[in-house]
From Swiss-Prot:
PTM note: Phosphorylated by AKT1 and ILK1. Upon insulin-mediated signaling, the activated PKB/AKT1 protein kinase phosphorylates and deactivates GSK3B, resulting in the dephosphorylation and activation of GYS1. Activated by phosphorylation at Tyr-216. Inactivated by phosphorylation at Ser-9. Phosphorylated in a circadian manner in the hippocampus.
Any single Pfam family the record assigns to this protein: Pkinase
Result when mutating S9A: Loss of phosphorylation; abolished inhibition of activity, leading to constitutively active
Gene designation: GSK3B
Any one biological process term the GO annotation gives: positive regulation of protein export from nucleus
Covalently attached lipid (S-palmitoyl cysteine), positions: C14
Catalytic activity: L-seryl-[tau protein] + ATP = O-phospho-L-seryl-[tau protein] + ADP + H(+); L-threonyl-[tau protein] + ATP = O-phospho-L-threonyl-[tau protein] + ADP + H(+); L-seryl-[protein] + ATP = O-phospho-L-seryl-[protein] + ADP + H(+); L-threonyl-[protein] + ATP = O-phospho-L-threonyl-[protein] + ADP + H(+)
Stated name of the protein: Glycogen synthase kinase-3 beta
Primary location class: cytoplasm
Description of how activity is regulated: Activated by phosphorylation at Tyr-216. In response to insulin, inhibited by phosphorylation at Ser-9 by PKB/AKT1 and RPS6KA3; phosphorylation at this site causes a conformational change, preventing access of substrates to the active site. Inhibited by IL22 treatment which also triggers phosphorylation at Ser-9, promoting inactivation. Inhibited by lithium.
Organism in which the protein naturally occurs: Homo sapiens
Compartments, record wording: Cytoplasm; Nucleus; Cell membrane
Length: 420
């Protein structure tokens, strides 16, 4: 944890949330082995509100913080491991994290399987429990492993992890949702498949132009300069800055802008990017244009990183870590960057010999910010595969109501038909 105050995930303007009829119906029993089995009435994360009984066992604490507690558990019906995030619910408001997670369905975002409410030890205390995909590792722990061994993370993994992060950001930004806490600890990893999933939407918010937002958001080291300047009208490009900090950290083996305070972090940023111009300051926060900064020249990006760092990685970093928010690449543009060209090679494999995870199954929703980029993002071999798997009219009709999942190959199929 960064030690920063946790921002609320309760929507400020929502009406009081109604206590669910299934609230509190939690049963505890024992299975034939004597293990404790908890059965709750839970609502599926996606789809209609149809509460159902869900049983889980082997519960243990795997994390906690100012937000609450995270448990690992095993679903009794499937044997799958899940993570259960338990947070105190203010009964006056809907929980913003829940509202956002119910909208999301993407291969690079941790899935909300179910949610349920439970009572606390104190009277009238209500907890919201989010039942999520369990993913065993994080980018933070993997990067720390290499750093402690005095090694750098293999570049192929840097490409895989960052590409999938940008895909997840392109998806949530297409809904106007800003994560506001991108950092290595919130990037879950399956070490065998190299699949990355973005997690922890406790700080996420749907940003509306003209509506103010709190500036004390995002964990230290990853805060965009406009946040340090106290801006309240920022955009989802703060996530892009944070992602740029993650990329730089994976290349360097340590945070690029460390600092225990906003001033310390700003000093570190100025050491690399140089003193911001008056115009750049105006773009970040107009209230600071008269502030006097020491005049420091930008440090060449090639000297920031190790000599063997791929030039494309440095070039991408320089396009993400820009003072002016509108000058930063969008997540979709970042995915199309030449740094990721190796991933578009049909012969690329993981170092363990496995195939790379799904990288080109873009939805029309994901591509909505810049549809023409599909020609770069979906390589020819992926278009051919998508065309071969395009459903017949009958199948397509039966799939018409499957929502975002049903659109999975639409973009690739359209691209394939246009290229043949």
């Amino acid at each position: 944890m960064s030690g920063r105050p946790r921002t609320t995930s309760f929507a400020e303007s929502c009406k009081p949330v109604q206590q669910p009829s299934a609230f509190g119906s939690m049963k505890v029993s024992r299975d034939k082995d004597g293990s404790k089995v908890t059965t709750v009435v839970a609502t599926p994360g996606q789809g209609p509100d149809r509460p159902q009984e869900v049983s889980y066992t082997d519960t243990k604490v795997i994390g906690n913080g100012s937000f609450g507690v995270v448990y690992q558990a095993k679903l009794c019906d499937s044997g799958e491991l899940v993570a259960i995030k338990k947070v105190l619910q203010d009964k006056r408001f809907k929980n913003r994290e829940l509202q956002i997670m119910r909208k999301l369905d993407h291969c690079n975002i941790v899935r909300l399987r179910y949610f349920f409410y439970s009572s606390g030890e104190k009277k009238d205390e209500v907890y919201l429990n989010l039942v999520l995909d369990y993913v065993p590792e994080t980018v933070y722990r993997v990067a720390r492993h290499y750093s402690r061994a005095k090694q750098t993370l293999p570049v192929i993994y840097v490409k895989l992890y960052m590409y999938q992060l940008f895909r997840s950001l392109a998806y949530i930004h297409s809904f106007g949702i800003c994560h506001r806490d991108i950092k290595p600890q919130n990037l879950l990893l399956d070490p065998d498949t190299a699949v990355l999933k973005l997690c922890d939407f406790g700080s996420a918010k749907q940003l509306v132009r003209g509506e103010p937002n709190v500036s004390y958001i995002c964990s230290r080291y990853y805060r965009a300069p406009e946040l340090i300047f106290g801006a309240t009208d920022y955009t989802s490009s703060i996530d892009v800055w944070s992602a740029g900090c993650v990329l730089a950290e994976l290349l360097l083996g340590q945070p690029i802008f460390p600092g225990d305070s906003g001033v310390d972090q700003l000093v570190e940023i100025i050491k690399v990017l140089g003193t911001p111009t008056r115009e750049q300051i105006r773009e970040m926060n107009p209230n600071y244009t008269e502030f006097k900064f020491p005049q420091i020249k930008a440090h060449p990006w090639t000297k920031v990183f190790r000599p063997r760092t791929p030039p494309e990685a440095i070039a991408l970093c320089s396009r993400l870590l820009e003072y002016t928010p509108t000058a930063r690449l969008t997540p979709l543009e970042a995915c199309a960057h030449s740094f990721f060209d190796e991933l578009r090679d049909p012969n690329v494999k993981l170092p363990n010999g496995r195939d790379t995870p799904a990288l080109f199954n873009f939805t029309t929703q994901e591509l909505s910010s810049n549809p023409p980029l599909a020609t770069i993002l979906i390589p020819p071999h992926a278009r051919i595969q998508a065309a071969a798997s395009t459903p017949t009219n009958a199948t397509a009709a039966s799939d018409a109501n499957t929502g975002d999942r049903g659109q999975t190959n639409n973009a690739a199929s359209a691209s394939a038909s246009n290229s043949t």
